[in-house]
Regions:
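Residue-level detector of functional hotspots within protein domains
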Residues: 3, 38, 176-178
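Extracytoplasmic electrostatic interaction patches
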Residues: 83-200
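Low-complexity, intrinsically disordered regions enriched in charged/polar residues
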Residues: 7, 21, 26, 33, ...
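N-terminal export/targeting and maturation segments
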Residues: 19-88
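Positively charged n-region of N-terminal signal peptides that target proteins for export
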Residues: 1-4, 8
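C-terminal motif of bacterial Sec signal peptides marking the signal peptidase cleavage site
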Residues: 13-16
Length: 200
């Protein structure tokens, strides 16, 4: 009986460890302290800015940020393809993204340790949409595991004249044909990817 009880306890312990194990490397919406919150509000970062905390294992060499447009059921690269070099051993950082419309001006900032990079893409010219065009976006809302060489969707934006807009979970980035079926005029995605490969 003691052997059965010990085996049962061991199984419970193993199941509990595997079910509750948090990812070692992850990206999640930033957890700001009061002072950071106040500064963010002062700078307008509580509007179209999205801040994320990043935890790595120290072996990442680059981070790539890409934007895509949905064309015929497939994602086509709009901006990105390059990347930002990370110093060896960096483990904690922050990323910020700011945009109203991914077709227009888009901003990104990457900070690891004392290194900081900020880039602006696109044009600030106003986009002429048909009357009645609406826009909605879904953003990464929880902790997401970082796997090297795998893109992580940060935002999906839909611009459409349709009255009803369905916005799927960000994991549907990997099934773009689902967005194509809905017939929206414009669907965009913003992703990040961490790599152990240096920029070439």
């Amino acid at each position: 009986m003691k052997k059965i009880l010990a085996l049962f306890t061991l199984l419970l312990l193993l199941a509990g460890c595997s079910a509750g194990a948090a990812p070692v490397m992850y990206i999640q919406p930033a957890e700001l302290n009061e002072e950071e919150e106040a500064v963010a509000k002062l700078l307008g970062a509580d509007t179209d800015q999205h801040l994320f905390d990043v935890v790595l294992d120290g072996t990442a060499k680059t981070v790539r940020v890409n934007t895509y447009v949905l064309e015929d059921g497939k994602w086509e690269l709009v901006t990105g393809g390059g990347g930002t070099t990370l110093k060896e051993g960096e483990q904690k950082g922050r990323m910020a993204f700011g945009f109203e419309d991914l077709r227009g001006e888009y901003r990104e900032a990457v900070q690891f340790g004392k290194d900081f990079t900020a880039v602006k893409y696109g044009s600030s010219e106003e986009i002429d949409d048909p009357e009645g065009t609406g826009r909605t976006a879904s953003f990464l809302a929880g902790r997401t595991e970082i796997v090297y060489e795998r893109e992580i969707p940060i935002a999906i934006q839909i611009n459409t004249t349709k009255n009803q807009v369905l916005s799927y979970d960000l994991e549907y980035f990997f099934q773009p044909e689902e967005y194509e079926k809905l017939g929206y005029e414009h669907v965009y995605a913003l992703t990040v990817m961490f790599s152990q490969e240096a920029l070439s």
